[in-house]
Amino acid sequence: MSRVCQVTGKRPVTGNNVSHAMNHTRRRFLPNLQNHRFWVESEKRFVKLRVSTKGMRIIDKKGIDAVLADLRARGEKV
């Protein structure tokens, strides 16, 4: 399972750890992904999504039905 948010498409990015002595070592910044079950009232069932916390806020704002419609339009299976 890849570390990609199903709603926003956020994925890991790379950067550097920088010590006090300004030594740089490569690292990955991972998105804050959560496996979450959302109740879809129109379908009378739960839908499991792997979403970032930003994705959860988008679902709170737009509603789960609108977000699922966007996902299905992209061809993602939910």
From Swiss-Prot:
What Gene Ontology terms describe what this protein does at the molecular function level? structural constituent of ribosome
- InterPro entries linked: Ribosomal_bL28, Ribosomal_bL28/bL31-like_sf, Ribosomal_bL28_bact-type, Ribosomal_bL28_sf
SUPFAM superfamilies reported in the protein's UniProt record: L28p-like (SSF143800)
The encoding gene is rpmB
User: What Pfam families does the record point to?
Assistant: Ribosomal_L28
Could you tell me the Gene Ontology terms of the biological process aspect for this record? Answer: translation
Q: Per its record, how is this protein called by name?
A: Large ribosomal subunit protein bL28
Family affiliation? Belongs to the bacterial ribosomal protein bL28 family.
Record-linked PANTHER family: 39S RIBOSOMAL PROTEIN L28, MITOCHONDRIAL (PTHR13528), LARGE RIBOSOMAL SUBUNIT PROTEIN BL28M (PTHR13528:SF2)
From which residue to which does the signal peptide run? Answer: none
Q: Which Gene3D superfamilies match?
A: Ribosomal protein L28/L24
- State if Flavoprotein is listed as a keyword: no
Q: Which HAMAP family match?
A: Ribosomal_bL28
